[in-house]
């Protein structure tokens, strides 16, 4: 599983990094995105949907860290 660590980064950087990871991934790959910017809670799911990918899991971890697991279901260009 590819991990995108956006802890300590604020909008719009987590979205930029998540998008780049999705663009560089192959269909079928799983990406884990970690962020602690409160805006990411809404921004990342919107990005995933916009790019046609699948949000497999979302959870709030300790210390305000948000964890998103995304499955790449189609190429992103």
From Swiss-Prot:
**Where is the catalytic site?**
11 (cysteine persulfide intermediate)
The organism's place on the tree of life at top rank: Archaea
* Sections of the chain in a coiled coil: none
InterPro entries, per database record: TusA-like, TusA-like_sf
Q: What Pfam family does this protein match (any one)?
A: TusA
Its family remark reads: Belongs to the sulfur carrier protein TusA family.
Q: What protein name does the entry list?
A: Putative sulfur carrier protein AF_0188
